[in-house]
Amino acid sequence: MSDERYQQRQQKVKDRVDARVAQAQEERGIIIVFTGNGKGKTTAAFGTAARAVGHGKNVGVVQFIKGTWPNGERNLLEPHGVEFQVMATGFTWETQNREADTAACMAVWQHGKRMLADPLLDMVVLDELTYMVAYDYLPLEEVISALNARPGHQTVIITGRGCHRDILDLADTVSELRPVKHAFDAGVKAQMGIDY
């Protein structure tokens, strides 16, 4: 491809991108969902949260399911003023106690509702929320209501597999992560600094 043809092609791309950017003028908080069976949902959420903190935004985090071991995202973000509320019961297949898991979920959800109502928070991460709805630990209607009632500038990031259709419909941005290959399938254990 000649330099002239390359330049013409790139100019067309630039014109299309510039036109789309010019049309997108609304400023408001959005709902982002990272779902699917692939690795990286929580990683994507915390990468976005770190970006927000880097720009001086106030971020709150609620972690469902995870939380019985130290994790890098908390070690990084908490010293920068990010509030973490963690269910801290571990994986539900380990606890095998529906009543206790539901109670723990509801307790940490109270913090989530508080964060979603807080006009000082620019972003709230609800890590692994999808499981809480799927397992009927949290009423879907209560989650939808809290999301709809949040301050207009607040962005919410929801992670987890099998996100309920009503949450997907409410979301502004949905990314579905698909597994292609995973080290765990080859017998490589979860590693600090990579997986947690």
Swiss-Prot record:
It catalyses: 2 cob(II)yrinate a,c diamide + reduced [electron-transfer flavoprotein] + 2 ATP = 2 adenosylcob(III)yrinate a,c-diamide + 2 triphosphate + oxidized [electron-transfer flavoprotein] + 3 H(+); 2 cob(II)alamin + reduced [electron-transfer flavoprotein] + 2 ATP = 2 adenosylcob(III)alamin + 2 triphosphate + oxidized [electron-transfer flavoprotein] + 3 H(+). Keywords: ATP-binding, Cobalamin biosynthesis, Cytoplasm, Nucleotide-binding, Porphyrin biosynthesis, Transferase. It is found in: Cytoplasm. One of its GO terms (molecular function) is corrinoid adenosyltransferase activity. Pfam families: CobA_CobO_BtuR. ATP binds at G36, N37, G38, K39, G40, K41, T42. Required for both de novo synthesis of the corrin ring for the assimilation of exogenous corrinoids. Participates in the adenosylation of a variety of incomplete and complete corrinoids. Homodimer. NCBIfam families: cobA (TIGR00708), PRK05986.1 (NF004637). This is Corrinoid adenosyltransferase CobA. The gene is btuR.
